[in-house]
Curated annotation (Swiss-Prot):
<comment type="similarity">
    <text>Belongs to the uridine kinase family.</text>
</comment>
<dbReference type="Pfam" id="PF00485">
    <property type="entry name" value="PRK"/>
</dbReference>
<keyword id="KW-0547">Nucleotide-binding</keyword>
<dbReference type="GO" id="GO:0005737">
    <property type="term" value="C:cytoplasm"/>
</dbReference>
<dbReference type="GO" id="GO:0043771">
    <property type="term" value="F:cytidine kinase activity"/>
</dbReference>
<feature type="binding site">
    <location>
        <begin position="9"/>
        <end position="16"/>
    </location>
    <ligand>
        <name>ATP</name>
    </ligand>
</feature>
<dbReference type="InterPro" id="IPR026008">
    <property type="entry name" value="Uridine_kinase"/>
</dbReference>
<dbReference type="InterPro" id="IPR027417">
    <property type="entry name" value="P-loop_NTPase"/>
</dbReference>
<dbReference type="GO" id="GO:0044211">
    <property type="term" value="P:CTP salvage"/>
</dbReference>
<keyword id="KW-0067">ATP-binding</keyword>
<dbReference type="InterPro" id="IPR006083">
    <property type="entry name" value="PRK/URK"/>
</dbReference>
<keyword id="KW-0963">Cytoplasm</keyword>
<keyword id="KW-0418">Kinase</keyword>
<keyword id="KW-0808">Transferase</keyword>
<protein>
    <recommendedName>
        <fullName>Uridine kinase</fullName>
        <ecNumber>2.7.1.48</ecNumber>
    </recommendedName>
</protein>
<dbReference type="InterPro" id="IPR000764">
    <property type="entry name" value="Uridine_kinase-like"/>
</dbReference>
<comment type="pathway">
    <text>Pyrimidine metabolism; CTP biosynthesis via salvage pathway; CTP from cytidine: step 1/3.</text>
</comment>
Amino acid sequence: MVKIIGISGGSGSGKTTIVNKISEVISEFVLISQDNYYKSVGDYEYEFLDVNFDHPDAFDNNLFYKQLKKLKENQSINMPLYDFINHKRRDETIKIVPTPIIIVEGIMIFVEERVRNLIDLKIYIDTPNDIRFIRRLERDMSKRGRTLESVIEQYLRTTRAGYYRFIEPTKEYADLIIPEGGHNDKALYVLSSFLKTLVKDSSKFF
């Protein structure tokens, strides 16, 4: 039976760090990023758009749920790919064949109850605001074609408020909260030990 591990936290919280840690324990898994399920917003320059990317409605939540459910049922999907430079969904998709363990990561994967119910292990990465902002700034400028001014404007306009309104409250649904941006050795040890046992016999937990 397919098991889903969900990793959430604010933008720049260190979700990739945890995915890399999991990869040291689990050799075969599929990674699903909620970012690929953003809705297309057209071909205009980002600075001229009044779009809130830090709101649950920015995602195609129905498609995200349906595809995650299919993977849970051991069915393949054609996952969308999102172009962050042009802010629209690409024409091509990528075929995802389910593995026994699937990792799904994203800032709002714990917001909807129907999605939470599909996730067997929920991990929340708790990271100080300044660290998250610096990480997001570096990522968006180096990988997403953003300017310093646009990242700061978005953070002040929607990102900060969206985190406190939608993301941080979902900590209550987490099975494990990892502090310090994913660099807490004791928490990572607990996670690694759990995953090793999970790989051997998932029936002990689910």
